[in-house]
A protein has these predicted regions:
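Conserved alpha-helical substructure of the radical SAM core
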Residues: 2-140
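A short, structured active-site edge motif that brings together acidic residues
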Residues: 143
């Protein structure tokens, strides 16, 4: 995964938006992977951290629901073949999603080279960690 971070480093040094767009166009035309897909399969959290928007009762009322697995399959069909990285959990708690293992497996099915999960880790067990890694998780970030 060192190559992914090298690409990110190179892209951050390029100042010209036109040159970046040309690079993306080149990657697209040569059928390379260039997207970072960030997904929150569920809008819920089991913590109420002060710095987080889930601690605000009014805001939390608007943050409800989860994606049906069929919706995630539709997203994956459209984007995963171009994804360089799949980030699961961008602000909510992905371990509350009942089909989390299927989401990771779906990323591997589409050969996404790097799959990362960000979680507070509260409900993770040894068995769930083992299953996530066995399904194809590359990185686990505890926040």
């Amino acid at each position: 995964m060192k190559n992914i971070y090298n690409l990110f480093r190179i892209a951050s040094r390029i100042r010209s938006q036109r040159l970046k767009l040309l690079g993306i166009y080149f990657l697209h035309m040569t059928r390379q992977r260039y997207l970072g897909v960030f997904i929150d399969p569920i809008l819920a959290c089991n913590f109420r951290c002060r710095m987080c928007y889930f601690s605000d009762g009014e805001k939390r009322k608007t943050l409800k629901g989860s994606l049906a697995f069929q919706d995630i399959e539709a997203i994956s069909k459209s984007l995963y073949h171009r994804a360089l990285k799949l980030q699961i959990g961008c602000g909510a708690e992905p371990t509350l999603y009942k089909d989390l293992y299927k989401v990771v497996a779906l990323g591997k099915q589409y050969k996404v080279p790097y799959i990362s999960l960000t979680t507070n880790g509260n409900i993770l067990t040894y068995e769930s960690l083992y299953k996530l890694v066995a399904t194809g998780l590359d990185e686990l970030t505890l926040s």
